[in-house]
A protein has these predicted regions:
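Active-site phosphate-binding/coordination module
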Residues: 42-130
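Short amphipathic alpha-helices in soluble, non-transmembrane regions
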Residues: 111-115, 148-157
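A short secondary-structure junction motif
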Residues: 135-146
């Protein structure tokens, strides 16, 4: 698209006028394409440039809010300060490590054992370890294998005491702390005293963030699928255009 739709353009214009603005963005499928090897994913150059410029503006905080582990997100995103990072669907903030209680550590060990029993020997499936839990990835698996593994994870480790499950596109994350992108948005808004929030996401896990937006905020769904977001764009290039429009409006 050459410019955001009229309703989104008007929303961005209003958003640009607030004194304290939080710009929160998912990474994969929003800033960077989803690829077979997640370690090779990088943000589109235009989006990266707009993010860096926005983050330098007074009263403007840009935060990447991703399902990736914080260290993984830092490695692929390529941003330093003042751009902020939140990983593990809000389970890891870049201002300090996540500390588990003894009970949570024991629950995580039990979760890891149960999850390993589900994925071991399954072709195209991998288990990712995170500070507060594990993630079952099935993007590389045959559809029948993927569904079998996800069903086993849903009915097994995901139901262990103290475990909260979050399902996304070809992934099932299980954690021993309650996390969501919606809670992360609430936390960031409170810490920053933000007058308004822009959030853009593409996955079902982003819907908790869209649900936390209120009057004056702007939610943008990237791609297809049901959503609570008020606005939608089709491609990552459209996201670049949105960020550039917001940057230009906030500089005025």
């Amino acid at each position: 698209m050459t410019a955001p739709p009229a309703d989104l353009d008007a929303a961005l214009t209003g958003l640009a006028r607030v004194p304290t603005l939080l710009v929160a963005l998912d990474f994969d499928g929003v800033l960077a394409p989803i690829v077979a090897d997640p370690s090779t994913s990088r943000p589109l150059p235009g989006s990266a440039a707009a993010i860096r410029a926005l983050a330098e503006l007074p009263g403007t905080t840009v935060v990447l809010v991703s399902g990736r582990a914080l260290g993984d997100l830092r490695a692929v995103a390529g941003f330093g300060a003042p751009v902020r990072l939140v990983g593990s669907h809000g389970g890891e903030f870049d201002d300090g490590p996540l500390v588990l209680t003894d009970e949570q550590r024991a629950a995580k060990e039990a979760l890891e054992r149960a999850a390993r029993g589900v994925v071991d020997g399954e072709p195209g499936v991998r288990l990712e370890d995170k500070p507060a839990g594990v993630v079952v990835h099935v993007r590389g698996a045959d559809p029948a294998v993927a569904e079998r593994v996800l069903d086993a994870a849903r009915t097994g480790p995901a139901r262990l005491p103290g475990v909260a499950a979050t399902e996304g596109k070809a992934v099932l994350e299980m954690a021993v702390v309650q996390v969501s992108k919606g809670l992360a948005i609430d936390t960031l808004r409170g810490r920053l005293g933000a007058d308004a929030v822009l959030f853009a996401g593409d996955d079902v896990t982003d819907e908790t963030a869209f649900a936390r937006l209120g009057p004056g905020d702007v939610g943008i769904k990237v791609g297809d699928g049901d959503t609570a977001a008020a606005h939608r764009v089709g491609t990552l290039e459209d996201v670049t255009q949105v960020l550039e429009e917001l940057l230009a409006a906030r500089r005025r």
